[in-house]
Amino acid sequence: MEEFKRYLELDRSQQHDFVYPLIFQEYIYALAHDHGLNRSILLENIGYDNKSSLLIVKRLITHLITQMHQQNHFLFSANDSNQNPFFGHNTNLYSQMILEGFAVVVEIPFSLRLRFSLEGKEIVKSQNLRSIHSIFPFLEDKFSHLNYVLDILIPHSIHLEILVQTLRYWVKDASSLYLLRFFLHEYRNWNSLITPKKSSFSFSKRNQRLFLFLYNFHICEYESIFVFLRNQSSHLRSISSGTFLERRYFYGKIEHFLEVFTKDFQAVLWLFKDPFIHYVRYQGKSILASKGTSLLMNKWKYYLVNFWQCYFYMWSQPGRIHTNQLSKHSLDFLGYLSSVRLNPSMVRSQMLENSFLIGNTIKKFDTLVPIIPMIGSLSKAKFCNVLGHPISKPVWTDLSDSDILDQFGRIYRNLSHYHSGSSKKTSLYQIKYILRLSCARTLARKHKSTVRAFLKRLGSELLEEFFTGEEQVFSLTFPKASSTSRGLYRRRIWYLDIICINDLANHE
């Protein structure tokens, strides 16, 4: 327990108090209110070191404010004149301004912490880590060696005071915490800001920045403690904490087992002694994959539930965590169905005059596009019916022909780009067929003609021009490999420029 406390104190010792006087400066609220200005310049161009200076920050912000005035940016807007009975006269403007300024200020030390953590590491472009596709090469490399996965829905019903207390370890400024507590208690339904239901948004969308920051900070705090406990539990040693009471006897049995069979079963025992565990978080969910047994995964399942309830006071249930065997079940993950496929093969071995067959099974990470949810998304967007039959898009008939073609082509290229990591391209061909025929029917409806007559008059090549396939994009990106691009295209391709999921690709 003492080691656990020292770990937390060491991790939280990198606190930066120099930014908090900015809360009382007028220009920080002008900077926060200007949504067209890229705030990342605060961290990209300052040249921070471990002795960060308030003077440098103030000088940079003054420069940014000068740019804002030169570009005729206005601080106040007529849309901000709504009244709020809690604050009183014309307070929607002032409350939003204060909250936006507070969000900008409180993000600075944590963004600096991220920059310091990336320094010295062999990461050429850290922005590539933002890509959603950067997760899949990791899974492709690791999951083929694993057996079970926990599909976890992270609880988000966090008590407001727990958030303030968690942030208190990092922020020494008491006034900032009082201000944060004031806003959190005014908007008690802030949890709706992190749920996917758009109808539940009751606060200005501009203020999502602070609430999403608090939620992500809370999750990162939970993950840092969880990773520390996982690292501690992976070593064969006695731990006096009551949480690991059962594990202490478990380790004693393993040590005795090692003494007896250490010569014959070293490889097997090594895997049993220190099983591989990989953790990935995405969209309020996370997955915990391991090479261990189902019994071990069930222990992790109930340990996580108790960990959330006892340490963070978040109510959770075992039903929010599902245990799946990768070889038998697919994981619905970021628009893909991911699983580990077993490829059996037979090898004939010849020894002198005798020959015999040896069976061998190779595990392969498989990613597929779930076509039924995709058709459901296209049907909801009025591109086809529930059976997947293409229909026209009447609301687009007022557009010009080029705009209609551009709209359909852009949707297909985005979907094809995002799902380029699919192991099989059949689903993409079906999506292309639906969008092409829907586009043709929309154009025919606009010109009061039939699809056959319209295509006969203009030619089917008109649609092909705007539906540039991923295979053609690949050959343009890698011209030297044009001779083999067709074979390479059939493989999975992961891109490092995808930072959001297309609405049609997100089936959840």
From Swiss-Prot:
Biological processes per GO annotation: mRNA processing; RNA splicing; tRNA processing
Similarity comment text for this entry: Belongs to the intron maturase 2 family. MatK subfamily.
Pfam family, one: Intron_maturas2
PANTHER family: MATURASE K
GO function term, MF aspect, one: RNA binding
Primary localization: plastid
Domain of life: Eukaryota
Name assigned to this protein: Maturase K
Natural source organism: Gordonia lasianthus (Loblolly bay)
Gene: matK
Location of this chain's protein in the cell: Plastid, Chloroplast
Alphabetical UniProt keywords: Chloroplast, mRNA processing, Plastid, RNA-binding, tRNA processing
GO CC terms, sorted: chloroplast
Protein purpose: Usually encoded in the trnK tRNA gene intron. Probably assists in splicing its own and other chloroplast group II introns.
